[in-house]
Amino acid sequence: MYQDLIRNELNEAAETLANFLKDDANIHAIQRAAVLLADSFKAGGKVLSCGNGGSHCDAMHFAEELTGRYRENRPGYPAIAISDVSHISCVGNDFGFNDIFSRYVEAVGCEGDVLLGISTSGNSANVIKAIAAAREKGMKVITLTGKDGGKMADTADIEIRVPHFGYADRIQEIHIKVIHILIQLIEKEMVK
């Protein structure tokens, strides 16, 4: 009944991944991002992650895999997803939704920390404001974006962009794979 739809969805996902893999710059960017994160941890820094909707879930998943575990037991790494409901509702109410991430970065971000900002469109105003706040604090910035990078293009130290112009879920599928690879590489770097 739905076999053709299922095949089409899986084929489109495979095609999106194949297109991402064709550009060696993506592979190098992932490696550089992992080393940057591990270097921050080794120097006593932390990573803050943020995004909206599914990207918010990815930001939380990233932090959870770092503080908890990925595939093997190891020490936890300092990672915080900006997802505290009381913070988000307070700042959203008192300042506005566009400030929910930047206020948190202003409060706990430090020089030497890293911000991971995730936006499939690259146009999330609250993530863009978080990037600006991170810069003010002397933090490094890594972004996971899609399409043409949107307004977030060229705002990060390292941008990992999925150049897919269809539905956002295809971009998110690559983002979560990148997140898992980042964690795997961070674990390797941390034992060097």
Curated annotation (Swiss-Prot):
Alphabetized InterPro entries for the sequence: GmhA/DiaA (IPR035461), Phosphoheptose_Isoase (IPR004515), SIS_dom (IPR001347), SIS_dom_sf (IPR046348), SIS_GmhA/DiaA_subfam (IPR050099)
Domain SIS span(s) in chain numbering: 37-192
Cofactor: Zn(2+)
Involved pathway(s): Carbohydrate biosynthesis; D-glycero-D-manno-heptose 7-phosphate biosynthesis; D-glycero-alpha-D-manno-heptose 7-phosphate and D-glycero-beta-D-manno-heptose 7-phosphate from sedoheptulose 7-phosphate: step 1/1
GO term, biological process aspect, one: carbohydrate metabolic process
Gene3D superfamilies xref list: Glucose-6-phosphate isomerase like protein, domain 1
Subcellular location: Cytoplasm
Principal location listed in the UniProt entry: cytoplasm
Major enzyme class: isomerase
A Gene Ontology cellular-component term: cytoplasm
GO molecular function terms listed in the Swiss-Prot or TrEMBL record: carbohydrate derivative binding; D-sedoheptulose 7-phosphate isomerase activity; zinc ion binding
Keywords, ordered alphabetically: Carbohydrate metabolism, Cytoplasm, Isomerase, Metal-binding, Zinc
Catalytic reaction list: 2 D-sedoheptulose 7-phosphate = D-glycero-alpha-D-manno-heptose 7-phosphate + D-glycero-beta-D-manno-heptose 7-phosphate
E.C. designation(s): 5.3.1.28
Residues annotated to bind substrate: 52-54, 65, 93-94, 119-121, 124, 172
Cofactor note: Binds 1 zinc ion per subunit.
PROSITE patterns named among the record's database cross-references: SIS
Binding site for Zn(2+): 61, 65, 172, 180
SUBUNIT field: Homotetramer.
Similarity comment text for this entry: Belongs to the SIS family. GmhA subfamily.
Remarks, miscellaneous: The reaction produces a racemic mixture of D-glycero-alpha-D-manno-heptose 7-phosphate and D-glycero-beta-D-manno-heptose 7-phosphate.
Its biological purpose: Catalyzes the isomerization of sedoheptulose 7-phosphate in D-glycero-D-manno-heptose 7-phosphate.
The protein, known as: Phosphoheptose isomerase
Gene, per the UniProt record: gmhA
